[in-house]
UniProtKB/Swiss-Prot annotation:
Belongs to the peptidase M48B family. It comes from Streptococcus pneumoniae (strain Taiwan19F-14). Keywords: Cell membrane, Hydrolase, Membrane, Metal-binding, Metalloprotease, Protease, Transmembrane, Transmembrane helix, Zinc. It is a multi-pass membrane protein. It holds the Pfam family Peptidase_M48. The lineage of its organism: Bacteria, Bacillati, Bacillota, Bacilli, Lactobacillales. Zn(2+) binds at H143, H147, E227. One of its GO terms (molecular function) is metalloendopeptidase activity. This is Protease HtpX homolog.
């Protein structure tokens, strides 16, 4: 079952790439149509930007993601307890030792990133290290090491890269519209135009506004299922389901992270770092912790 999931994750990598590049193409066409009067030109530029961004994330994902999240690298001398727990989990999972980082934040959280097990890294918050006992820390690190072993990190890295590129393009277009300029000129050109031009204008505006939301929804669909698998895989590594249950219970009671976490990075964490209420619950990057605990109790 586990090897089937790993193979499935590799297939999903290509599907994910296709979906995100289609979204990039849509945003690029919209930006080009509105601001340079060439939808095709905007599409080509957007795809080039997305391709370069994705490649840079794949080859430098650890440095980029850790920098985005304010993490600092540690070793056996500076964080011996965390180092030895990660070392044990990596040994059991039969993967190379990942690099280790700490995020100075009182909230309880952790994540893994990288393009493959040979270039992976894990990060934990200072709050998690202060609150979790040894068994709970093993469970959390087992969860993150499982993401590495199951090749979830490659999917996550690509998702972060392309979602960030889509958000960047949409944000840039929004600022250009706010400033006026080309957007106003396009509106003036289309004021006396035919119905098709008006429809294209509306569709382009909607694409710019909705593409970041669509990218987030794609991340949600992928992230939620792999969290269940990583929880179960952690129990497989530690042979201690109660440790994972206790860790999840503490994570559930943790406050949101005090530092800003961008939307693209949120899906990486073991616990949703924002924990908004009301309408925001619809866009949680993780399944409810109560549901995750219930699944573990049924193992």
């Amino acid at each position: 079952m586990l090897f089937d999931q790993i193979a499935s994750n590799k297939r999903k990598t290509w599907i994910l790439l296709l979906v995100f590049f289609l979204l990039l193409a849509l945003v690029g066409y919209a930006v080009g149509y509105l601001f340079i009067r060439s939808g095709l030109g905007g599409l080509v530029i957007a795809l080039i930007i997305g391709f370069i961004y994705a490649l840079s994330m794949i080859f430098q994902s650890t440095e980029i993601v850790m920098s985005m999240n304010g993490a600092r690298e540690v070793d056996e001398q500076t964080a011996p307890d965390l180092y030895h727990v990660v070392e044990d989990m990596a040994l059991v999972a039969q993967i190379p030792m990942p690099r280790i980082f700490i995020i100075d934040d009182p909230a309880l959280n952790a994540f893994a990133t990288g393009s493959n097990p040979q270039n992976a890294a894990v990060a934990a918050t200072s709050g998690l290290l202060a609150i979790m006992n040894r068994e709970e820390l093993e469970a959390v690190m087992g969860h993150e090491v499982s993401h590495i072993r199951n090749y979830d990190i490659r999917i996550s890295t690509i998702a972060v890269a392309l979602a960030s590129a889509i958000t960047m393009l949409s944000s840039m277009a929004g600022r250009m519209m706010w400033w006026g300029g080309a957007g106003r000129r396009r509106s003036d050109d289309d004021r006396d135009g035919n119905g098709l031009e008006i429809i294209m204008l509306v569709v382009s505006l909607l694409a710019i506004v909705l593409a970041p939301l669509a990218a987030t929804l794609v991340q949600l669909a992928i992230s939620r299922q792999r969290e269940f698998l990583a929880d179960a895989s952690s129990v497989e590594l530690t042979r201690n389901p109660q440790g994972m249950i206790n860790a999840l219970d503490k994570l559930d009671n943790s406050k949101p992270m005090s530092r800003h976490v961008d939307d693209a990075s949120s899906a990486l964490y073991i616990n949703d770092p924002k924990k908004g209420g009301g309408f925001q619950k619809l866009f949680y990057t993780h399944p409810p912790i109560s549901e995750r605990i219930e699944r573990l109790k049924q193992m």
